[in-house]
C-alpha cells in the first residue's frame, strides 16, 4: 500500500511515480509547494477515506509522514 500512497502523491503533484519514494520531501519536488501540499492532502484523504487534522498539516514534510494518518489503510 506504500506504493499506492506514492502513486496518489504523484498524481496530485503531476509527477511520475518513479520520481518519488517514501523519503521524498516537499522541497525536493518543484510542484510540492503550499498549494501542492493541499492538493496532496486532499487526494490522500479522498483516496484512503481518512482525515488529517489541520493542526498536523505543517508537520508533514515527506511522503512517509502521511503513514501514521492512514493507520490500517496501509
Predicted regions and their residues:
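Phosphopantetheine-dependent thiolation modules in NRPS/PKS and related acyl-activating systems
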Residues: 1-41, 46-74
